[in-house]
A protein has these predicted regions:
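Hydrophobic h-region of N-terminal signal peptides that target proteins for export
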Residues: 9-16
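Short, acidic/small-residue loops that bind anionic groups at enzyme active sites
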Residues: 148-171, 180-186, 310-312
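Conserved anion/nucleotide-ligand pocket segment
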Residues: 179-240
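ATP/nucleoside-binding phosphotransfer catalytic cores, i.e., glycine-rich phosphate-binding loops
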Residues: 287-347
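ATP/NTP phosphate-donor binding region
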Residues: 25-126
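Short Gly/Thr/Asp-enriched flexible loops that form oxyanion-binding sites at enzyme active sites
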Residues: 135-154, 297-298
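Internal helical hairpin/lid segments
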Residues: 243-297
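Positively charged n-region of N-terminal signal peptides that target proteins for export
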Residues: 1-4
Length: 347
């Protein structure tokens, strides 16, 4: 028996030795950018943001990843005064009767708590910038409850986020003068953002020239206009809710995450039917990630592009990926000779 036991252990060891190495589990939060470095993750955000005080708040899903907290620490090490709102990292699992969505990782605390933090961050006169901890699901619910009369108009205050936060950015574009909307990285994105993208973020916020970035024409043509940037499915949600998103004369940058080709096609057709693209100067399709239908999505976009009757491009670095160039939605973008640039802001 002893001999058989030893033999069995040797056989198991041999099988395990020949087995492929276990692959790392994909981060459940698609907004988290995982650093490829094996060393301790660190990013230098000193002098990146043109402010002294930054507020961090959670408008939607609970930021469960450790990367979200690490992002806060990186801001602190960047010599910013960081005000983390009281409920930012409150785990909904510790509360009774909270929204525990069946889809893992998208639970959120009650909207009343999120709303309280939102008001607190916004109306704090010391806060010069608000960065969302993450998106997920829940911004639409928050916006349904916001009393805009309780928010001060702060056109110089930067409000940054993307993904589900696209909804808030759309509302800020509609309500011009409330804040300076920026489609850009959130707490979980900070930890793995490449140095080149951090430089691009700094230049975008400071008004310096950004680019050029090479893009691929689907419908050729030069164009210019202020940027409107966000998540495809949230643009569709906003239009269905009758948000008055100002796209006339602007360049629309669109990204997607966890979408099938059929869903992309339907959302694009719906947006066209709802006149989202009417009067736009151009459209740029960015990254579509976390999908097994990348080629099919590319085909859908290629077939859809000519129907818009305006210049259409693909390949700009924006979305749920490390290649994430933040975009200030108050700044003008230009596309010329298949290159995207944001000209320096005249002061």
């Amino acid at each position: 028996m002893k001999y058989l036991l030893i033999l069995s252990l040797l056989l198991v060891s041999a099988v395990l030795a020949g087995a492929p190495a276990r692959q790392p589990v994909q981060e459940s939060d698609p907004e988290v950018i995982v650093s490829k470095s094996k060393k301790k993750v660190t990013r230098d955000y000193r002098n990146v943001f043109p402010v002294k005080t930054i507020a961090v708040t959670t408008p939607a899903s609970y930021p469960h990843s450790g990367a979200n907290r690490l992002g806060v620490e990186m801001l602190k090490k960047g010599n910013y005064k960081v005000k983390v709102m009281p409920h930012t990292f409150l785990d909904p699992a510790t509360l009774k009767n909270t929204n525990r969505k069946a889809h893992k990782g998208y639970a959120s605390i009650p909207v009343e708590m999120r709303l309280e933090d939102f008001y607190k961050a916004w109306n704090d006169p010391e806060v010069e910038m608000i960065i969302c901890s993450r998106g997920g699901n829940g911004c639409f619910e928050l916006l349904e409850k916001i009393d805009w009369n309780k928010l001060k108009k702060r056109p110089e205050m930067i409000f940054m986020g993307y993904s589900d936060v696209t909804l808030i950015l759309c509302k800020l574009l509609e309500k011009e003068g409330y804040a300076r909307p920026v489609a850009g990285p959130m707490m979980g994105s900070m930890t793995g953002l490449p140095p080149a993208m951090i430089t691009g973020l700094k230049k975008m916020l400071s008004g310096e020239k950004v680019g050029p970035y090479k893009v691929t024409p689907l419908v050729a043509g030069d164009c210019s206009g202020k940027a409107v940037a966000g998540l495809l499915q949230r643009f569709a949600t906003a239009k269905r809710a009758n948000y008055a998103i100002p796209t006339k004369g602007k360049i629309i940058f669109i990204e997607g995450v966890s979408l099938s080709a059929a869903r992309v096609k339907q959302e694009l057709l719906d947006l066209k039917k709802m006149k989202f693209f009417d009067g736009a100067a151009g459209v740029v399709f960015c990254h579509f990630t976390r999908t097994k239908e990348g080629k099919e999505i590319g085909k859908v976009i290629k077939e859809f592009a000519p129907s818009l009757g305006i210049p259409v491009y693909t390949g700009f670095p924006f979305g749920h990926t490390a290649k994430h160039q933040a975009m200030d939605l108050t700044r003008t973008a230009e596309i010329k000779n298949n290159m995207v640039i944001f000209p320096a802001v005249k002061k």
